């Protein structure tokens, strides 16, 4: 009996060693690459001078967007974002509104993680790195330079 118990313990340890390292909460979804801007003026200049199809997307919740947003921005709130499912409503809405050759300029709150996640998701579902761009310091810093 002791030998059987030791066998199961060793088997459990082996399984955890083999599979346990790839199941952390931080890598539940592999995000695609994106372009990050940390300077508001650079983000603004790049957006306004971009010659191809483009979209400015505010990822903040609807109430914050309605209280104030950048001129020309569309609201696709990240709070409905489902990190586990490629067919999440957010992704469907994005793909329905913008062809994958559209350059997406994302901004949100100073909580950079959610904006990073949606830009990474956009990159992965077909927009690619060059068409997935984010401003990482939030709406308040960006509105000071937006004309």
What are these language model-derived features?
Residues 13, 21-67:
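Flexible, polar/low-complexity N-terminal or interdomain linker segments that lie immediately upstream
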Residues 23-39, 66-147:
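Rhodanese-like catalytic fold shared by cysteine-dependent sulfurtransferases
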Residues 5, 55-58, 104:
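Generic, low-specificity signal for short hydrophobic/alpha-helical stretches with a mild N-terminal bias
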Residues 1-21:
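Sec-dependent bacterial lipoprotein signal peptides
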């Amino acid at each position: 009996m002791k030998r059987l118990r030791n066998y199961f313990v060793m088997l459990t340890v082996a399984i955890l060693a083999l599979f346990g390292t790839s199941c952390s909460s931080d890598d539940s979804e592999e995000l695609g690459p994106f372009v990050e801007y940390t300077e508001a003026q650079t983000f603004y200049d790049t957006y306004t001078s971009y010659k191809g199809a483009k979209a400015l997307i505010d990822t903040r919740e609807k109430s914050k967007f309605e209280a104030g947003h950048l001129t020309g921005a569309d609201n696709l709130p990240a709070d409905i974002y489902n990190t586990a499912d490629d067919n999440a409503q957010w992704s469907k809405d994005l793909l329905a509104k913008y062809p994958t050759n559209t350059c997406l300029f994302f901004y949100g709150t100073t909580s950079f993680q959610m904006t990073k996640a949606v830009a990474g998701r956009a990159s992965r579902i077909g927009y690619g790195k060059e068409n997935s761009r984010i401003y990482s310091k939030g709406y308040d810093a960006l509105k000071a330079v937006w004309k």
